[in-house]
Amino acid sequence: MKYNIGDSISINNTDWIISEHRMGRGREWLYTLSHEETDGSYTTMSLNERAMDGLALTGGFIGSSDN
């Protein structure tokens, strides 16, 4: 696992938070990202580690809530 719960990611000018990570089929990490809408509802999406690596290469990561 490379990415931590609470890390922020910007995708298409929208901030997403890593809310969950789990081991998928085989040995692949899967990450659940969540975005809170203004009405309090949440939108979620799941990405595998390869997709997350692509976001890191394009500068999508904002930072960690641990800092």
Please provide the spans of the model-predicted regions:
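Short coil-to-beta transition motif at edge beta-strands of beta-rich domains
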Residues: 1-11
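Intrinsically disordered, low-complexity, charged/polar segments
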Residues: 39-67
